[in-house]
């Protein structure tokens, strides 16, 4: 989302650990030079994470996944992505995620969450693998806030009907809830990343055999490509875009004295505002960081859904809103299906999204884009794919199906919901209107032609449209270092 140019030393960006006891003051070495504050996880833990075999964080691919991100036209790329095969040392488990940063330090926040969330989740899974007493010792249900209490009650309701869920789901849900809680605390205590008006979204997918668990914070999105009874490829949205105008989200924000409204020049974009100040105008209801709004209804509690995979399910697309702002779910699914190979599928989606930005928002600079494609079908190829980072192949199993979600706003996904926690997937039939030059199923334009258009070619589109910024302004009581007029370049 927004862009940032920080004076922080580049080595700071590589630090990815908890800092609850790290000193926040600058220490002096005997030589008289200033020394940076120590970070608890800046040493062995981070080196261990970076050396994990099967972990991809940059543009590349493996036998079961591909990743691609492209910087927008406003500076530093604030999107981050992750594929971690053999997660928790399980050959049947894969963790995928995309993270969309915003604000002055958004690029640092998104990378921090990308690096530390899997590490913390792995630790929590080992801790909560026992009985309910172990989760009690972890503090998940001790002295909860009103937000945690709502989520915990929802979890307890799920436990009353365990027949709907496999054995792995509830421990994983507990671990993911606790992980996000700890992740936000770690960001608040970080000595070098100022998260007061900076944050990130997060969409994580954990695939374990036939089971799929999706955790969502913010407005990034996960979409499943599957086949219907006629063997036609359809898109099923696995997450809800957690915007401030959702009824339950808006109600919570108002209870906490925050405000939700849209500006006159962008009436379709609801934003979160401080009670007595027209700032910061955050365009999402949940996020890591953004502590200026945490007392006014913004939360970092993930919306967690469960899905049972079937043999008809083909692949999952995770992407930031730089993609979904200009492409529909069905269009993204069709682009991946039309890609020359699995290795280029994620790049094909990003390239098409960049072209669509030029068409849909000709007066604005395109947003950062990040895409992760996780393929669910088995591959018969024997060798591994050459990539920029070494990865292991984890065998994927074909599966059978039921879709279950605990979200309160499932109607916003246009799903037919029942009184239980079971929902019917959304089969996207209607496609958003897109320019004919970039329509995937156009009679005259192929995918290859669409993504090969020259940059200097003239574009025709609606005039007067502007891109949506995640964050509009910095509160007046923000730290003096960032209150200069130059902050606008970060939005």
Swiss-Prot record:
Residues 64-376 form the PPM-type phosphatase domain. Its cofactor is Mg(2+); Mn(2+). Binds 2 magnesium or manganese ions per subunit. One of its GO terms (molecular function) is protein serine/threonine phosphatase activity. Keywords: Hydrolase, Magnesium, Manganese, Metal-binding, Protein phosphatase. It catalyses: O-phospho-L-seryl-[protein] + H2O = L-seryl-[protein] + phosphate; O-phospho-L-threonyl-[protein] + H2O = L-threonyl-[protein] + phosphate. InterPro entries: PP2C (IPR015655), PPM-type-like_dom_sf (IPR036457), PPM-type_phosphatase-like_dom (IPR001932). Residues 17-28 have a biased composition (Low complexity). Signal peptide: none annotated. Residues 1-39, 391-422 are annotated as: Disordered. Residues 1-16 have a biased composition (Basic and acidic residues). Mn(2+) 1 binds at residues 100-101. Disulfide bonds: none annotated. PROSITE patterns: PPM_2 (PS51746). Mn(2+) 2 binds at residues 100, 321, 367. Its EC number is 3.1.3.16. CDD domains: PP2Cc. Belongs to the PP2C family. This is Probable protein phosphatase 2C 6. The lineage of its organism: Eukaryota, Viridiplantae, Streptophyta, Embryophyta, Tracheophyta.
